[in-house]
């Protein structure tokens, strides 16, 4: 027993050191032990009640959240299934839903395209996310993705299928080892949102970032022309396996790629001008044009006289008319020109069936304003609500349609077959209900001429068509113009086009840029916001070519074997002082770039007189014999820094005053524009597994809201029926059940622990 310490002088109420121990009786000790045990049990019971009350509260919240999410998904499923029957889309219900959507003004999908008769892709872009939906006429696996050049190697793919009610979905890529089967990415950057199949179709909806920041396996979705890859097969992989070699016959499942622009497009639903009594429709067709044999080009001109448009109308849409599926392969461009004046040749041509454009002597000057322009791959163009192209017989009654025929992939086995006749053309829609602004077309670029030289065997050749500040300063209104759409054109070796804008000596962001252009798809792009251009701006069409596959030089011209560098812009308000704003390297620049000092006078063919080592050589021979491999740098520097001839024409066949005597030079830019690529950290998704379920309710609540489809946006038979699987609802139910069972097990274990403590 411890001894008490010696007392010190302290206040009576304060005691230092441990208190003195006193002896207790056994009965008192027993009573104290029982009291402590009862207190401990009471504390445990209170702890049990508090903890379990809190956990029961959490459990109720979990169940309520699960029921609410399941109800939302079930409602969405019922909307889809309610608009269709088991065999296809219910016409009455679909019409009702479409009418309701139209009445509410809510968008359905931004864009939709049929890649073939059995495969439709729909998409919507919200901020930096893009959501796709595949509707494919198959009960096997489907795939959709992107390729940098149309080849399988390096392709970025999303693959999925539905098997026994379970959706399988993976982010994949095609390796460069020659195997066409896409393999699963180590980083899963595509998120499944919905998957089902019915008696005929498989439907998958999924989301990804425009730029997933995974350049090793994914392709960023930009304003460039994308090469869309798609595939589908009648069978699913066995047992849902995603291991290499389990995808049935991928080489045959792939279909030919389609070049397409995904971002700068007019949104759906487009207006239906044919059902508007205020809209007039006019078909401008060629008449029995004999298509050229082989790969020979043909430029055909057909004049139309429109005399019955007695008051001002606005052109609001145009689209191609194909005479037959065979003629599609021949059509390259269709351009509708507005002709000024009443020349005798215009009236003469209006009475004719048409003629080759080279036989129209004064047409290029009389018909200098472009009304509409269509290129291969385009589905037409719809003007925005703020502008339309003005049409009125008192202003212009003659319209020239120029059609460029050129079959890039001719079947020479049919060379001696009977020539086909074509009656293709343009369908235009115009209305007397005028838009707020008159629209105009301005062509910017390199004038088609032999002085536009592209050397052979080079990966990157830069050409620039300059619209100089003298011409924009003269023609543009004081408040400037608003550019709302752009079409970029090259021919077969063009790879990149940019429309640059320079104000004084500062380069502004490019008006348009495509670093992956495709000759098979050159359409007008609707800019997200109109770009303002002021008088005195310099506009430059910069084109980059890859001539590494060519052994001889390529010259500028109109045929597909020659090259082009043109950017067509649609803008408002319209002005007539400037419709063509091109440039052309000056003859001294061309000669200097080839090491030529002087040409001989009055020589035919053209001969070189100096320097002495080239004297007597023809200009054509110099073009052929020039050492392009070792002297390309000097050539490129001379053409970009040398002088050029501005070509500025207005709608009424007038040259911009003073421009015919100007000699232009490249502008000294003191502040260049550089785009910085910024990749935000990726949101981690589930690692690749053999079964990838849709995201849980918490993730689904963050996905962009997509209104269900009307009859026009569901491929026939693709609607969900009563027999369709709905894995999103089932997966959510399974997830909620697992959480509920886990909570019950936890409560049971904690109760057993409490009973054990009470017994001890």
From Swiss-Prot:
Keywords: Disulfide bond, Glycoprotein, Membrane, Transmembrane, Transmembrane helix. One of its GO terms (cellular component) is cytosol. Residues 1-34, 678-701 are annotated as: Disordered. Glycans are attached at residues 78, 198, 223, 668. Disulfide bonds join 339-367, 467-581, 543-565. It holds the Pfam family DOMON. SMART domains: DoH. Residues 117-233 form the DOMON domain. InterPro entries: Cu2_ascorb_mOase-like_C, Cu2_ascorb_mOase_N, Cu2_ascorb_mOase_N_sf, Cu2_monoox_C, DBH-like, DOH_DOMON, DOMON_domain, PHM/PNGase_F_dom_sf. It is found in: Membrane. GO terms for biological process: dopamine catabolic process; norepinephrine biosynthetic process; octopamine biosynthetic process. GO terms for molecular function: copper ion binding; dopamine beta-monooxygenase activity. Its main location: membrane. The chain crosses the membrane at residues 47-67, 740-760. It is a multi-pass membrane protein. The keyword Glycoprotein applies. Residues 18-34 have a biased composition (Low complexity). Belongs to the copper type II ascorbate-dependent monooxygenase family. This is MOXD1 homolog 2. It comes from Drosophila melanogaster (Fruit fly).
């Amino acid at each position: 027993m411890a001894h008490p310490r010696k007392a010190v002088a302290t206040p009576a109420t304060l005691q230092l050191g441990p208190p003195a121990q006193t002896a207790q009786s056994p009965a008192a000790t027993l009573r104290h032990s029982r009291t402590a045990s009862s207190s401990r049990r009471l504390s445990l019971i209170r702890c049990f009640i508090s903890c379990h009350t809190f956990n029961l509260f959490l459990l109720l919240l979990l169940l309520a959240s699960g029921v609410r999410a399941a109800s939302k998904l079930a409602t969405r499923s019922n909307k889809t299934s309610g608009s269709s029957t088991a065999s296809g889309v219910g016409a009455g219900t679909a019409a009702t839903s479409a009418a309701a959507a139209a009445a509410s003004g809510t968008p359905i999908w931004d864009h939709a395209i049929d890649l073939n008769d059995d495969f439709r892709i729909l998409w919507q872009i919200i901020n930096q996310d893009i959501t796709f939906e595949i509707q494919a006429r198959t009960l096997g696996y489907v795939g959709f993705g992107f390729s940098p050049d149309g080849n399988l190697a390096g392709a970025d793919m999303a693959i999925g299928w539905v098997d026994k009610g379970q959706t399988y979905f993976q982010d994949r890529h095609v390796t460069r080892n020659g195997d066409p089967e896409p393999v699963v990415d180590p980083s899963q950057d595509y998120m499944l949102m919905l998957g089902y199949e019915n008696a005929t179709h498989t439907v998958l909806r999924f989301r990804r970032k425009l730029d997933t920041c995974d350049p090793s396996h994914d392709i960023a979705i930009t304003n460039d022309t994308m090469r869309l890859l798609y595939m589908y097969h009648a069978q699913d992989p066995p047992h849902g396996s995603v291991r290499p070699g389990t995808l049935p016959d991928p080489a045959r499942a792939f279909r030919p790629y389609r070049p397409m622009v995904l971002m700068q497009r007019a949104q759906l639903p487009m207006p239906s001008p044919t059902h508007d009594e205020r809209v007039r429709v006019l078909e401008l067709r060629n008449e029995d044009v004999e298509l050229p044999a082989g790969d020979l080009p043909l430029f055909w001109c057909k004049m139309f006289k429109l005399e019955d448009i007695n008051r001002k109308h606005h052109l609001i849409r145009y689209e191609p008319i194909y005479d037959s599926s065979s003629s599609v392969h021949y059509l390259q461009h269709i351009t509708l020109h507005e002709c000024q004046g009443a020349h005798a040749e215009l009236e003469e041509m209006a009475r004719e069936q048409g003629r080759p454009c080279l036989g129209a002597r004064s047409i290029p000057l009389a018909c200098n304003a472009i009304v509409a322009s269509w290129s291969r791959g385009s589905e037409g163009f719809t003007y925005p609500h703020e502008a339309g192209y003005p049409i009125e017989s008192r202003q212009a009654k003659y319209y020239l349609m120029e059609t460029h025929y050129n079959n890039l992939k001719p079947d020479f086995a049919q060379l001696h077959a009977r020539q086909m006749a074509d009656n293709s053309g343009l369908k235009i829609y115009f209305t007397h209900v005028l838009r707020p602004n008159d629209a105009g077309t301005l062509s910017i670029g390199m004038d088609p001429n032999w002085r536009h030289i592209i050397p052979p065997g080079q990966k990157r050749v830069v050409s620039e068509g300059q619209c100089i500040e003298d011409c924009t300063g003269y023609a543009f209104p004081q408040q400037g113009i608003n550019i709302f759409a752009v079409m970029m054109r090259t021919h077969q070796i063009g790879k990149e086009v940019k429309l640059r804008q320079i104000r004084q000596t500062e380069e502004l962001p490019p008006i348009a840029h495509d670093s992956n252009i495709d000759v098979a798809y050159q359409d007008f792009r609707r800019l997200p916001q109109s770009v303002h251009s002021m008088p005195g701006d310099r506009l430059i069409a910069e084109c980059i070519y890859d001539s590494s596959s060519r052994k001889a030089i390529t010259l500028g011209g109109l045929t597909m074997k020659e090259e082009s560098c043109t950017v067509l812009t649609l803008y408002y308000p319209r002005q007539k002082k400037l419709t063509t704003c091109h440039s052309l390297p000056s003859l001294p620049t061309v000669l200097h770039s080839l090491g030529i000092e002087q040409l001989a006078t009055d020589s035919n063919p053209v001969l070189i007189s100096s320097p002495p080592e080239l004297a007597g050589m023809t200009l054509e021979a110099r073009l052929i014999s020039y050492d392009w491999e070792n002297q390309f740098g000097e050539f490129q520097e001379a053409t970009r820094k040398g002088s050029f001839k501005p070509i500025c024409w207005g709608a009424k066949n007038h040259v911009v005053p003073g421009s015919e005597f100007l000699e232009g030079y490249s502008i000294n830019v003191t502040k260049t524009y550089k785009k910085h690529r910024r990749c935000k950290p990726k949101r981690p998704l589930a690692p690749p597994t053999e079964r990838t379920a849709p995201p849980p309710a918490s993730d689904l609540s963050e996905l962009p809201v997509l209104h269900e489809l009307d009859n026009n946006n569901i491929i026939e038979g693709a609607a969900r029926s009563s027999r369709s699987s709905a894995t999103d609802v089932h997966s959510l139910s399974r997830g909620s059940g697992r959480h509920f069972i886990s909570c019950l097990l936890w409560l049971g274990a904690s109760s057993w622990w409490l009973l054990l403590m009470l017994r001890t």
